[in-house]
Curated annotation (Swiss-Prot):
This is Ribosomal RNA small subunit methyltransferase G. It comes from the Bacteria. Keywords: Cytoplasm, Methyltransferase, rRNA processing, S-adenosyl-L-methionine, Transferase. Its EC number is 2.1.1.-. Residues 218-237 are annotated as: Disordered. One of its GO terms (cellular component) is cytosol. The gene is rsmG.
């Protein structure tokens, strides 16, 4: 997917990028490739692949109408080089984006990237989701949480749902259908007072399969969740 094909694909969804937004995506690509040599951010570095498998893939929830261009508080867990939240932020500047990542070198890259792209209302924190999820400044604080290929839903739900306000939603972007994951995650969702709103399979323009699963928080999360760092993965709910 060339940059021009990327713009055209967005235009079909009535998203027409300004010259500044196009420049932001171009600079994002260039900085990603430049810094990838230093800190190994991604295995995908060819321009057409980055525009398809990072940029376009990240904005699927926008194209599907699941995220409006409003000043919602969005948390991205394990965003790596900023996916999916920063491509969303470029397109919908009103979003207030927070990223938590466990590797400090990625946080340094994100700070540099945000400055270069002139993004405001973006906040980056180094640490574990299990720790921040028990911090009153983060817990039950967000309208949306996104996670792209981070963990199985059984584990991911405990890492993310405590951050949501009641009525808030987890948007889990997956590389394949989530039917089996949802079955396995059902006990965790019950314990976390959340339920599946939708799970939709779709394709990228090149035919690659993807899945977007949305989980809605129904009641306050019990205080004991998330458990200590490492426990959600070692002993899933």
């Amino acid at each position: 997917m060339t940059p021009e094909e990327f713009y055209q694909a967005l235009a079909k969804h009535h998203i027409n990028l300004s010259a500044k937004q196009k420049e932001q995506f171009d600079l994002y690509f260039k900085l990603l490739v430049e810094w990838n040599d230093k800190i190994n951010l991604t295995a995908i570095t060819e321009e057409k692949e980055v525009y398809l498998k990072h940029f376009y893939d990240s904005i699927a929830p926008l194209l599907s109408g699941y995220i409006p261009n409003e000043s919602l508080k969005l948390l991205d867990i394990g965003a790596g080089a900023g996916f999916p939240s920063l491509p969303m932020k470029i397109i919908y500047p009103q979003l207030d984006v927070t990223i938590i990542d466990s590797l400090n070198k990625r946080i340094k890259f994100l700070n540099l990237l945000a400055d270069a792209l002139e993004l405001d209302k973006v906040h980056f924190y180094h640490g574990r989701a299990e720790v921040f999820g028990q911090d009153k400044n983060f817990r039950a604080h967000f309208d949306l949480v996104t996670a792209r290929a981070v963990a199985r839903l059984q584990v991911l739900s405990e890492l993310t749902i405590p951050f949501l306000k009641v009525g808030g939603q987890l948007l889990a972007l997956k590389a394949s259908a989530a039917d089996e994951e949802l079955k396995t995650a059902q006990n965790a969702l019950n314990l976390l007072f959340s339920q599946t709103t939708s799970s939709d399979n779709y394709q990228l323009p090149n035919g690659d399969g993807r899945n977007l699963t949305i989980i809605t928080k129904k009641k306050e999360t019990p205080n004991k969740y998330p458990r200590k760092a490492g426990m959600p993965n070692k002993k899933p709910l």
